[in-house]
């Protein structure tokens, strides 16, 4: 069973080689690896060539813009009946694809995810804390905050494995400010796909706050708000509040845009149904220093995943 692995990259050949190496070490050997670049990049081309494996191909994205466009371009060149995605600064554990394919064989149609080991400059932990079980809307799982300093749900593109035909129903929105989230939301709520999670750590995500990244571009709070309004028809009121006060609100606070404070509170209550945690988190972002929030997150972090 051929799996096409799509890796968008941008002038980071050493990180890319780590990512490619983790794919080539997979116990599932039927692989098609597509590295996508936005523009001619001799160093990346040289790195790919140095791998010396015919399964690794370099593709130039004909419509360069975002990681979403690069992922779509990679899918257009894919030969596999299954697609998987990997950011160039992340890596997989060797049995990632084997375990997900086995899981998918009895849970179709589905996007199959897994647990991740998150590595930051100051800590290492497992995420998500709560495994999605399809008993609640996917948007509430991702955004309906049930704790003050950190949500408990996550589905990230480096963990994705799904059938090619299912990907073609949705594809990534190249105009989206949050394309990973939107892809999962539309896959579940519009295409009717299940989201399944292998309850094992199979991906390592490296989060380095000062490192520029191609696949996790940071948008302004106003761009995130426009995105939220564009997907409001498919969101529950609870999820709308969570995104408005959590995602958009935290970005506005980081930007110091004080006029956003009343506007976002109004929208959250007008179009959503906020929990107390949504409001407390929103206020905390505006009223407490970032270093203090980090310390508390570390103290309150729950160890180990649980069912949703």
Where do the model's predicted regions map?
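Catalytic core of nucleotide-sugar-dependent glycosyltransferases
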Residues: 201-209, 213-243, 259-271
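Flexible acidic/His/Gly-enriched loops in nucleotide-sugar-dependent glycosyltransferase catalytic domains
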Residues: 53, 69, 97-166, 217
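Glycine-rich, basic loop-to-helix element that forms the pyrophosphate-binding segment
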Residues: 61-78
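Acidic helix N-cap motif at the loop->helix transition within catalytic regions
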Residues: 41-50, 91, 95
């Amino acid at each position: 069973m051929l799996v096409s692995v799509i890796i968008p990259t941008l002038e980071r050949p050493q990180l890319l080689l780590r990512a490619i190496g983790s794919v080539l070490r997979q116990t599932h050997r039927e692989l098609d690896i597509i590295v996508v670049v936005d523009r001619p990049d001799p160093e990346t081309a040289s790195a790919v060539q140095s791998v010396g494996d015919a399964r690794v191909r370099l593709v130039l994205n004909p419509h360069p813009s975002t990681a979403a466009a690069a992922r779509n371009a990679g899918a257009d060149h894919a030969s596999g009946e299954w697609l998987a995605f990997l950011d160039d600064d992340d890596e997989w554990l060797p049995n990632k694809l084997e375990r997900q394919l086995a899981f998918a064989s009895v849970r179709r149609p589905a996007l199959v995810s897994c647990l991740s080991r998150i590595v930051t400059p100051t800590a290492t932990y497992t995420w998500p804390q709560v495994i999605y079980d399809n008993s609640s809307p996917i948007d509430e799982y991702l955004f309906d905050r049930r704790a003050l300093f950190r949500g408990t749900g996550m589905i990230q593109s480096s963990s994705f494995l799904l059938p090619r035909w299912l990907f073609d129903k949705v594809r990534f929105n190249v105009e989206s400010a949050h394309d990973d989230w939107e892809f999962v939301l539309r896959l579940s709520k519009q295409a009717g796909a299940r989201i399944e999670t292998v309850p094992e750590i199979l991906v390592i995500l490296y989060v380095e706050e000062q490192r520029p990244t191609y696949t996790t571009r940071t948008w302004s709070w106003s761009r995130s708000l426009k995105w939220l309004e564009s997907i409001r028809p498919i969101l529950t009121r609870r999820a709308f509040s969570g995104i408005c006060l959590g995602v958009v609100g935290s970005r506005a606070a980081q930007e110091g845009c004080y006029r956003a404070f009343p506007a976002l509170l109004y929208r959250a209550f007008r179009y959503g149904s906020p929990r107390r945690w949504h409001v407390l988190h929103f206020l905390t972002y505006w009223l407490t220093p970032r270093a203090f929030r980090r310390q508390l997150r570390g103290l309150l972090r729950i160890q180990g995943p649980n069912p949703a």
